[in-house]
Every structure is written in C-alpha cells, then in structure tokens.
Amino acid sequence: MVSTNYAPEHAGIGPYATQIAEHWASTGHDAHVLAGMPHYPAWSVEPEYRGVLRRTEKRAGVTVHRRAHTVPPRQTALRRALFEGSILLHGAAAPPRMPKPDLVMAQMPSLAGGVTAARLAARWKVPFVPVVQDLMGAAAAQSGISGGDKAAAFAGRAEAYALKRATLVGVIHETFVDRVVAMGVDPAKIRLVPNWSHVAKPTKPRGETRHHLGWAPGQTVVLHSGNMGLKQGLEVLVGAARLDPEVRFVLMGDGSQRAALASMAADVPNLDIIPPAADNGFPDVLAAADVLAVTQHAAVLDMSVPSKLTSYFQAGRPVVASVAAQGGTAQEVRRSGAGVLVPPEDPEALLEAVRSLAGDPEGADALGAAGPVHVAAHLSREAGLARIDALVDEALGGNRP
C-alpha cells in the first residue's frame, strides 16, 4: 500500500490505511506500506521523526517504509504542490526494497502517493487499486486555498493520471462517482467502499469525563473534533460562540488554521481550543459533549466526506451539521438519522439548532442513539474491511493468495 498518512497518525486517512494493512498482516500476508513521516493533523513532523530521511520499521506485523517530505504549516497552493512534489520525488528516488507484491493499493490523497502507486504497480506488472478518500482537484477549487484555481487544474490532472491506470477504483462515497467518471475512468471499474467507525465505543460515565474536562453539569457543550483546515470553515463556530456566552464551544484537534482560529477567538471566553485526545480517551470525550459539530464551507459539495462522522455516530450524541444540503456529508447525516442539518456559514442557524437540542433532552438523546445503531448496521470495522477484501479479490481476479 502507498499511503502518505499512516500510524501513529490518529486522525483522517491514517487510521484507515493502518487498519487495512494490519488486517492484511493479521491474516497471514506480507504487508508493506510506503508512507510519509507522521505529521497530521498538526502539519508538523512528530519529534522522533524530525531530521529522518528514510526509515523502515515494523508496526503490528506491517513493514513500513517511510520517506521524508516537506510539511507546510500553512496551506497555500504552492506549498501544497511542494509537499506533493517532495513525496513523488523521494518515492521515485528510493522505492521500497521488497519482494514483488500481488497488488498495489493507494490511499488518495496524497496525489503523489496515487501517482507513485500507479507507477510501482506498472513496474511490477500487478493490479493497481486506489481508494479515493478525498478528491483533491475539487478540494482545491472548493476549499478556498490560496491559488486554488491553478491548483485544482494541476490536482485534477494528477488524479486522472493515477485513476485511469487503475484496475479498479474504490470510492468512499457515491457523490465521488461522477467526478471520477469525468476524469476518464470507466464506470464499470468503480466500487463503493465506505469508511467505517475505527474508534471504540465510549466506556466511562459522561459525568466523570465532563468533570475531568472542566465542563459544568448543566452547561451545553458543543464539540468539534478533528482537522482545523480551510475546508472545515470553523469560523462559523467562533461566530456562534460570540452569540451566546452560556454555550460552551470546544475545538479539539490541530491543523493549518489552528493559530488563525485561536487569534480570532481570543476575545471569546466560551470557546476553547484543546489538543487531540489520546486514542484511548477519545471516544469518551466525544460522548461527554452535548452536541457534536461538523462544519464545511458552503462551496464544499463533492470533494470529501469527513472521517469524523463515523466516530461521531459511534459516540451516541446528536450531530449538528453546518454543511451544504446537497453534499455527501449532508447525505450521510440524513442516512444515519443521528443529527440535524443547518445552512453552512450561518452562526445563527447553528446556534439555534444547538439551543433546540438543549431544550429537548429526550429528542437529543433519541437522535444520538441512532448513531451507534447506524454504525452497527452499516459502518462496522468488520464490514468495512470485508468490502476492502472484496475489492482486492476482484482486482486479483479471484486469485487472492
């Protein structure tokens, strides 16, 4: 597998790549991953990997071949291009030393990872199967990144290069299909492989976790967990916090916009920005909140579906989604029955939804309870990995070793 993001990264694509590779290893396969240096979501290389050019390590039975790359602390089109370029160049200059594989899978993004995987598969003459987690061409156009128009054109060409060379293409949501087809991919080659909930169920009493976090028993707490990037449009939460000092808003995580958000919220005492929770405490923190928020800019339609949603649903708390009604994120919230939708970039509407849930505890609990039911029925780890297995088996023509 080629995946720039991999363990110990705990957010975004990394956990999915890790669980797939570890699943392969646990079932007796010799699993190798060409990965970057751990840097997400902080967009800062973790201390133990700083200054490391290349490293090969064994993690849970998986051989991980790491290659250094640039890590832009602030996202612009040029810096993103340098990031992708460094991944591509280092991957080409120092491909993993390993036996010929049966198949090459890529997690996309990164774009460079997809291109590298396509080239490795061609060199080894084995099937190539990319799994599209985000559409970077659409992301550049829709996220508001500086220089986005030129970046969108470049990213679209790189995506098309990789995807048109695939044996099969996995997409995590049906809203991606039309764009993938527009890149020249045969619709008959596209398979739906939704992500799954990769976190455990909460285990601690909510009151205990709230006390530990300093959240008062009667206070309404709205929590956003995950990446603080451009496409999230987290300014809407800062705006909502300004409107009602009695409601506590918590942004938990890291990302390229963290410093800007901290500056924007410097005079908002009821908004806290806290570091990511440890993996073993993460589910309990989500469950301790009254409302879980997912936000996106209004322009974000078909470029991504936040991986945080699967974790939110597992936590058993109601979701307020400030997203475009016609996008994939809204579809998933509707499908789950575990939340409510409000217009994107509208602090007043978001706050009104939060107040409505706070004023109807039974209704809020009913919405929240729908989340774990949806996970059990559709988003379990076992079901997700079975879909990946089926994708691999089909690409190998039923001749999986």
Map each language-model feature to its residues.
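A short, well-ordered alpha-helix in the C-terminal region of glycosyltransferases
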Residues: 349, 356, 363-378
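Membrane-proximal helix-turn-helix segments that form the acceptor-binding/catalytic region
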Residues: 115, 119-123, 149-169
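A short helix/loop element that forms part of the nucleotide-sugar donor recognition site in Leloir-type
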Residues: 49-54, 202-215
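Nucleotide-sugar-dependent
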Residues: 232, 276-287, 292-313, 319-331
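Carbohydrate-associated surface elements
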Residues: 37, 175, 196
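Conserved donor-binding/catalytic core segment of Leloir-type glycosyltransferases
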Residues: 216-232, 238-242, 250
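N-terminal subdomain of nucleotide-sugar transferases
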Residues: 1-52, 56-57, 239-242, 400-401
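Nucleotide-activated donor-binding/catalytic signature segment of Leloir-type glycosyltransferases, i.e.
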Residues: 247-250, 259-283
